[in-house]
């Protein structure tokens, strides 16, 4: 089969020919239809410090996908050949304290699909059946292919009650844009998103934000007070950028008693005004991945109840043009980029 692999240290991803993997007794063999390029895949492509310290090479990459069950192990129950599935990319141990308590997203021994074990940028993927999520028929392939990052957005956005609240999101990447759409869908009052990338701020507008703010040119507090008539600060914050200055600004504009969810990963140490955190009595929660599998059920329900993610999907390529897909991601002028394993050449 064909697969996209990190074959050696250094920049790049390579198309290779390799053997179709054999499922173990508790595994599914999934034939991949479509995949999506994640920021993690870009880190691996660029071979930055995180990637070089984390990913063994060679490694088939990718963890955002939709496919169909093509085979299964002898112990698998509840799936049939031809079932359309996506899957949880964090493979947990099942025996640590958190796993045994049903909190698998907190597993200390998590392995990442496409990071620590072979990934989904391939014609076939082997995945523990426990990790597979059977998809409702009314969720299209393009949307199903981005369920993994959508899950990050849903986990972050639904960490706190949003009904009637004023929400600040820092970082208008695809996950930030999807989190904004979730916040509006479930009843937030104002949803404000900040970034310095005009392309991505425009995507956020298409996803329904109240106001998109380029903080390189506009003052966030002025927008909040003068345009939106908000004089006490934001109730809920979602930090999606990994930017230290963005997080510092978020802390400064939160209302007393505000709640902050952190998904963005900083590239280095970040200075925090702990006095503001203490005297405003802020709640800060770290987010990693998705709750298994409550987040997945909520994702499906949100789509089935009318949440539209299609504006965030901006590029499609056949697998023969995978390099163009990575180039689009590297440009910073894209939302989600879909790679079609059933088409050689296609772009939009």
UniProtKB/Swiss-Prot annotation:
Zn(2+) 1 binds at residues 38, 63-64. One of its GO terms (cellular component) is cytoplasm. The active site is at 40 (charge relay system), 43 (charge relay system). It comes from Deinococcus radiodurans (strain ATCC 13939 / DSM 20539 / JCM 16871 / CCUG 27074 / LMG 4051 / NBRC 15346 / NCIMB 9279 / VKM B-1422 / R1). HAMAP family: Thr_dehydrog. The keyword Transmembrane does not apply. It is found in: Cytoplasm. The record marks 148 as: Important for catalytic activity for the proton relay mechanism but does not participate directly in the coordination of zinc atom. Its cofactor is Zn(2+). Gene3D superfamilies: Medium-chain alcohol dehydrogenases, catalytic domain, NAD(P)-binding Rossmann-like Domain. Homotetramer. NCBIfam families: PRK05396.1, tdh. This is L-threonine 3-dehydrogenase. Coiled coil: none annotated.
